[in-house]
Amino acid sequence: MKKKCKIGDKIPKFKIPLSDGNLLDSKDIKDKKYILYFYPKDNTPGCTTEAKDFTNKIKEFKKLNTQVIGISKDSLETHNKFINKQGLKILLASDESGKVLEKFGVWVEKNMYGRKYMGIQRATFLINEESKIEYIWEKVKVKGHVEDVINKIKSS
């Protein structure tokens, strides 16, 4: 088990594909704030709500010079179907191998109805202009989350 990222840590090194055809390279995460939000699965109720909430506030994030990127294990094909079906205005990154999830400490053992399995813990990371983790929301509850993120960016 990898150690979890902490506030103040430099982000781990990684490269994963983005829904717009580009590559998300950790070395390029600088010079503005980034929201990297990790979510379990495209086209599921909580994940759809979270993606739409980020989309609905995208203009506000742009005013705050902040790039929003959602990350899950879904394929780029699934991401693009999700984006088109839901009218999303955010980028999604595909981590099919789960290596980035592990580096950020969000690939965890879960327990549902007594059954243990590995899955993504919904979490959001605020990354500052120096590529350091400024804030972490763990075990995110979707309702009101995007407003919390915006308020944190405004106060930082």
Label each region the model flagged.
Residues 1-156:
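Chalcogenol-based redox active-site neighborhoods
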